[in-house]
């Protein structure tokens, strides 16, 4: 690792005059390291020196021997997680020796590793892609023929990339000098593994002071990343037509889920010499205009004062605008400082938020005495008049708040007099400061992501003169899981009520359309650099017109301090929807969302079936590591099932992207007719080992994720065991 960093450092020095390069310790995500040669990918390319591996004496028999001992000298190898590793044991002998590998003294088999490995006997090499911490250990190659054997052991250490705050290139932004009327440019280079949020900030004075009462400087946000802003655009700040008022201190501020970094530069403004050389006649003319303008201004001012006195004392609207202050107490979010510390790990592009508390100093608890005691900056684009909102019945509760139905008059700009049904998110009475921070973060995230037909969209917010209300779209048909279950045909095996007539009869095209809509929603979220982390049917809502909308994508979840194997106070983790790399190594990417999308497809084509029913969590871990996957649902075509299994590939890079899924589903949907109703004779099946289900009762805990009472009821479905090694649900 040291030699690699050292080489990169030399390259940077050599090219410093030509371009700006990344620091040597920032290794790209898709870099492939080979223990003995970092210049080769070690994956799909043949070895340049492969001839060494085939040394063979045709004249006499010989026991195995090493053909290149230099490649065996380095025994200890440390590589970053997610890279590809190749171990080589170049050997010769007559007859050509066979090769086998041991890990920690035991035979190394494909099923011992998620994603397996490659063995190239021709080059005597072992290749492992996307290594994770569980791959650490001793790897021994044994070369043998009938005349003897030799062996060599490598030790592999997988180095997890420790999260770090953004790194700003030294010397940038640089101090700049320009003349009045000219243009100034500041450049800021930001390096960060997690997606950074970048802001340009201007320091200014208020009431003659640059520092506020709390000791923090007064700041004004000049430029921030938006939905359609590229990294290159946000890294450059232009100040056009500079005046003396523009002189001062400018800061480039970058924050991610780990922390914040900032560099400051000064803008110096010089007078325009050409303008100073104007003739005296021009100065005289200017002076005349100034005196005349001053006299006119005084007259107008006198008239206005007299008029105001006649109308009586009016309300004072001259209070200074809200300002944003730099806080070191927690990871920066958009326009927000939270007085209490927070260790939450936000999404990589979590927006920056500012909250100013007025709680009295003698309040020792973290509970909010009243949400109205918190001041939130007003966003005119999204602010909705509180008096036009009429709250209705509760719709449900979440981990930090509750949701109620409401009527909002004029929230649709095209129909200002009409009332629309909406859903309103608000805090509970016992909400904490962190709960408020989370709700504001979710609101700001939804602002950043923008609108799409297949996600729950933000409609507005009430942030002033009362508790925080976040207004979102209302989906009248509830979550997708219950929507599908209530539409199971009466004759379908394990329907809730065989005498019940379903509200609507589902066709095969309905299910494909549902899947296609959700793929489009996830494609949009991925394009906005949003990782969902909890994609499942329970987190999809259905509107009155059967439009599928992904929900809870803006929720900032804490993933640093979670026990993946035990029930927590917030319920169960969605282990049955989580990709192996997220489950075992806490690696969350768009490709881990693709895995969850495959499970969501399985839920759809089983009409709300529960994944892996009857399988304990510990057994599920073992099955996933061994490469087992759920069987094809009865109402699913081979092509769609292949799409599911592609989403469940062990190596994340081998899974399809959401863009590819949208294209494939669009094609399938176009070819599907409307008359294909569900075949009631097809049972719903899934993989399960052929052992009896020993649970004494059915629990909603199998599907409840963040709240033990996520469902009002979860009827126990009868199970038919030992039917071709499967369990039906």
Swiss-Prot record:
Gene3D superfamilies: Immunoglobulins, Phosphorylase Kinase, domain 1, Transferase(Phosphotransferase) domain 1. Residues 389-678 form the Protein kinase domain. The chain crosses the membrane at residues 286-306. SMART domains: IG, IGc2, TyrKc. ATP binds at residues 395-403, 425, 473-475, 479. Residues 31-55 have a biased composition (Acidic residues). PROSITE patterns: IG_LIKE (PS50835), PROTEIN_KINASE_ATP (PS00107), PROTEIN_KINASE_DOM (PS50011), PROTEIN_KINASE_TYR (PS00109). Glycans are attached at residues 39, 138, 151, 175, 207, 228, 241, 256. Residues 1-21 form the signal peptide. The modification Phosphotyrosine is found at residues 374, 494, 564-565, 677. The active site is at 534 (proton acceptor). Disulfide bonds join 89-141, 188-252. Autophosphorylated. Binding of FGF family members together with heparan sulfate proteoglycan or heparin promotes receptor dimerization and autophosphorylation on tyrosine residues. Autophosphorylation occurs in trans between the two FGFR molecules present in the dimer. Residues 720-729 have a biased composition (Polar residues). GO terms for biological process: apoptotic process; positive regulation of cell population proliferation. It is a single-pass type I membrane protein. It catalyses: L-tyrosyl-[protein] + ATP = O-phospho-L-tyrosyl-[protein] + ADP + H(+). Its main location: membrane. Residues 307-729 are cytoplasmic. Residues 22-285 are extracellular. Keywords: Apoptosis, ATP-binding, Cell membrane, Cytoplasmic vesicle, Disulfide bond, Glycoprotein, Golgi apparatus, Immunoglobulin domain, Kinase, Membrane, Nucleotide-binding, Phosphoprotein, Receptor, Repeat, Signal, Transferase, Transmembrane, Transmembrane helix, Tyrosine-protein kinase, Ubl conjugation. Its EC number is 2.7.10.1. Belongs to the protein kinase superfamily. Tyr protein kinase family. Fibroblast growth factor receptor subfamily. Monomer. Homodimer after ligand binding. Tyrosine-protein kinase that acts as a cell-surface receptor for fibroblast growth factors and plays an essential role in the regulation of cell proliferation, differentiation, migration and apoptosis, and in the regulation of embryonic development. Required for normal embryonic patterning, limb bud development, lung morphogenesis, osteogenesis and skin development. Plays an essential role in the regulation of osteoblast differentiation, proliferation and apoptosis, and is required for normal skeleton development. This is Fibroblast growth factor receptor 2.
């Amino acid at each position: 690792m040291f030699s690699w960093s050292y080489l990169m450092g030399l390259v940077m020095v050599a090219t410093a005059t030509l371009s700006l390069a990344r620091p040597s310790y920032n290794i790209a995500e898709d870099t492939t390291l080979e223990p003995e040669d970092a210049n080769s990918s070690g994956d799909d390319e043949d070895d340049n020196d492969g001839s060494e591996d085939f040394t063979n004496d045709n004249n006499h028999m010989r026991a195995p021997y090493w053909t290149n001992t230099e490649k065996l000298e380095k025994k200890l190898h440390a590589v970053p997680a997610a890279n590809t590793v190749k171990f080589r044991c170049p050997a010769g002998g007559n007859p050509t020796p066979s090769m086998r590998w041991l890990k920690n003294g035991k035979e190394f088999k494909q099923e011992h590793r998620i994603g397996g490995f490659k063995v190239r006997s021709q080059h005597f090499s072992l290749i492992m892609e996307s290594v994770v911490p569980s791959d650490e250990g001793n790897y021994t190659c044994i070369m043998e023929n009938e005349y003897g054997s030799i062996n060599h052991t490598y030790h592999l250490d997988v180095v997890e990339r420790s999260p770090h705050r953004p790194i700003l290139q030294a010397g940038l932004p640089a101090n700049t000098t320009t003349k009045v009327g000219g243009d100034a440019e500041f450049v800021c280079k930001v390096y960060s593994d997690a997606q950074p949020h970048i802001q340009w900030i201007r320091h200014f004075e208020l009431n003659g002071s640059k520092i506020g009462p709390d000791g923090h400087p007064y700041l004004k946000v000049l430029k921030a990343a938006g939905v359609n802003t590229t990294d290159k655009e946000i890294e450059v700040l232009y100040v056009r037509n500079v005046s003396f008022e523009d002189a001062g201190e400018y800061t480039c501020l970058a924050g991610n889920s780990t922390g914040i970094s900032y560099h400051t530069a000064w803008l110096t403004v010089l007078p325009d010499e050409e303008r100073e050389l104007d003739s005296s006649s021009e100065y005289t003319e200017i002076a005349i205009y100034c005196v005349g303008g001053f006299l006119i201004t005084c007259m107008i001012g006198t008239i206005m004062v007299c008029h105001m006195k006649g109308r009586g004392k009016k309300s004072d609207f001259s209070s200074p605008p809200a300002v944003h202050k730099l806080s070191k107490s927690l990871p920066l979010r958009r326009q927000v400082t939270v007085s209490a510390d927070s260790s939450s790990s936000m999404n990589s592009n979590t927006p920056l938020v500012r909250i100013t508390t007025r709680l009295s100093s003698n309040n020792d608890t973290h509970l909010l005495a009243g949400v109205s005691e918190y001041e939130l900056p007003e966003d005119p684009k999204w602010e909705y008049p509180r008096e036009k909102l009429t709250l209705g019945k509760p719709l449900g509760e979440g981990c930090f708040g509750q949701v109620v139905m409401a009527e909002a008059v004029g929230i649709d700009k095209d129909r200002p007099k009409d009332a629309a049904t909406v859903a309103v998110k608000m805090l509970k009475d016992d909400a904490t400061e962190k709960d408020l921070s989370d709700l504001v973060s979710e609101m700001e995230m939804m602002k950043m992501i923008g609108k799409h037909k297949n996600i729950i969209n933000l409609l507005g917010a009430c942030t002033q003169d009362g508790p925080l209300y976040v207004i979102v779209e209302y989906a009248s048909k509830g979550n997708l899981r219950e929507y599908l279950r209530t539409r199971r045909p009466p004759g379908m095996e394990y329907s809730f009520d065989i005498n019940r007539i379903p509200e609507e009869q589902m066709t095969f095209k309905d299910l494909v359309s549902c899947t296609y809509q959700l793929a489009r929603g996830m494609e949009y979220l991925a394009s906005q650099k949003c990782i969902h982390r909890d994609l499942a049917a329970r987190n999809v809502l259905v509107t009155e017109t059967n439009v599928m909308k992904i929900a809870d994508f803006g929720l900032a979840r804490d993933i640093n301090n979670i026990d993946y194997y035990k029930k927590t106070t917030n319920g169960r983790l969605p282990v049955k929807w989580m990709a192996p790399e997220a489950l075992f190594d806490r690696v969350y990417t768009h490709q881990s969302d693709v895995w969850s999308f495959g499970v969501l497809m399985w839920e759809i084509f089983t009409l709300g079936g529960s994944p892996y029913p009857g399988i304990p969590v510990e057994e599920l871990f073992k099955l996933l590591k061994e490469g087992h996957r759920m069987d094809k649902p009865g109402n699913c075509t081979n092509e769609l099932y292949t799409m599911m299994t592609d989403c469940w590939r062990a190596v994340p890079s081998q899974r399809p992207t959401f863009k590819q899924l949208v294209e494939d589903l669009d094609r399938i949907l176009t070819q599907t007719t409307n008359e294909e109703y569900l075949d009631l004779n097809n049972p719903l099946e899934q993989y399960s080992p052929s052992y009896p289900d020993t649970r004494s009762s059915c629990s909603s805990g199998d599907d409840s994720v963040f709240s033990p009472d996520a469902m009002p009821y979860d009827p126990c479905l009868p199970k038919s065991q030992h039917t071709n090694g499967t369990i039906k649900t």
